[in-house]
Amino acid sequence: MVKYFGTDGVRGIANKELTPELAFKLGRYGGYVLAHNEGADRPKVLVGRDTRVSGEMLESALISGLASIGAEVMRLGVISTPGVAYLTREMGAELGVMISASHNPVADNGIKFFGADGFKLSDAQEEEIETLLDQDNPDLPRPVGTDIVHFSDYFEGAQKYLSYLKSTIDVNLEGLKITLDGANGSTSALAPFLFGDLEADTETIGCSPDGYNINDNCGSTHPELLAEKVLETESDFGLAFDGDGDRLIAVDEKGNIIDGDQIMFVIGQEMHKNQELNNDMIVSTVMSNLGFYKALENEGIKSNKTKVGDRYVVEEMRKGNYNLGGEQSGHIVMMDYNTTGDGLLTGVQLAAVIKMSGKPLSELAAQMKKYPQSLINVKVTDKHHVEDNEDVKKVMDEVETEMNGEGRILVRPSGTEPLVRVMVEASTDEDAQRFAQRIADEVQSKMGLE
């Protein structure tokens, strides 16, 4: 069976790999699987997209596929991924679909599904859709005549979502100056409206999408321009979102970049103080900084590690009934409010902590001392056997001994590329780079491409 779904839906180069034909089939078969699972003859489906030029093309094809199975489709227009997840749940829809490739370049696009509960589909549901995709025109229902349903626009859904986000905090943000970077994506209009409505003084960059400039040297994967703007405008802090608004990276008043680990620590510390952190636990991935775990330990907060990927964080949170988790990359899940990483929600919560504490972000984040980190990608012939390679393990053991507990090693295969990622954290930049290079050289020697 062909594997269409990755860790975050179906992605590819728009009109080449992710074609309108495939989008039609995903709509038709995805609509059928979810309608069948929910016991709905005429499922309600919400469809949102980011600002990519290919979004409208794929949206039209997807909606046609959904309509062909008898779905009642409501178009949300440009909205964030977590906005789709929230509205799917809130409006009692059987299915939510987001058309976006998140932080990827403009040429890419993707389609991800949310079930009626607002969570991404299970592996079993994705496999059911893939089975239908592999069949040649499977025999599925085809409504005709009056059984075909109109689709409608529900662009006011974005406002409903923003009103909800505003209700998650008890303070306004008057007196705070915040610079916002919308990555020329889904949050370009949403973020300025939300933070302005909360009475913050806002400056913006990356909030002028033209269909082609999404994530182009802006947003959470390029926070350097935001750092410059924060200093230039003397803002209290800056918030950078990614193309579909499910990530957040911050910048403090001194221009320092504050990553997902630090944001989770600041918010988690406040939740713990207020006895709002379920089981005194934060869920993170193996990529979180060693300094993150040490800072949590100092605060009496427990941690739980998962594989890289926000879906694994969410799985662990649901299993243990935890309400805060996320990734260093800025996917932060606050389960009390939403079912997926939500950059706007995280930004609002972080801003509320800053406002209520009366402390600058630099001071709040400084309680977590980050260990210098070095990451090297090595192209290999077979990424899946790196953990079994005795020579690589021997060098890793030697480095562990030399670090004497003041560092961490992570060697893992990439989830999407023919790469092995070597990550080392150590007490100094020099040590982190030296140790990472030593391990990477061994991986290259034993497993690398000629």
From Swiss-Prot:
HAMAP family: GlmM_B. Disulfide bonds: none annotated. Mg(2+) binds at residues 102, 242, 244, 246. It is an enzyme of class 5 (isomerase). It comes from Staphylococcus haemolyticus (strain JCSC1435). This is Phosphoglucosamine mutase. The gene is glmM. Catalyzes the conversion of glucosamine-6-phosphate to glucosamine-1-phosphate. The active site is at residue 102. Binds 1 Mg(2+) ion per subunit. Keywords: Isomerase, Magnesium, Metal-binding, Phosphoprotein. Activated by phosphorylation. Pfam families: PGM_PMM_I (PF02878), PGM_PMM_II (PF02879), PGM_PMM_III (PF02880), PGM_PMM_IV (PF00408). Its EC number is 5.4.2.10. Belongs to the phosphohexose mutase family.
